[in-house]
């Protein structure tokens, strides 16, 4: 009996290890299709656009546009394209059109490490 119990716990441990590794990367990840995604906590109605904080769950971004008729969403994509040195068409809102918790997808070929480094640099400017 002990062998069976040990065998099942090994199987569980092996499946848990890969699952816990990706969330440790933080708010910037790669989706199954290979695109880089960024979890955003939007703060619309601010005086100026800025990356306010980087947490393990999301990147806090202040948006200088009102949260009505998608203005803040468009401004968020424009601002992130400027910060990340990408074309505006390469930064698209994937989820969260009417929520403060958003997911932005980057269609350009870049790595999560490069994106995180640029976001950290922008956050330190404030």
Curated annotation (Swiss-Prot):
SMART domains: DUF167 (SM01152). It holds the Pfam family DUF167. InterPro entries: DUF167, YggU-like_sf. It comes from the Eukaryota. Keywords: Phosphoprotein. The keyword Signal does not apply. This is UPF0235 protein C15orf40 homolog. It comes from Mus musculus.
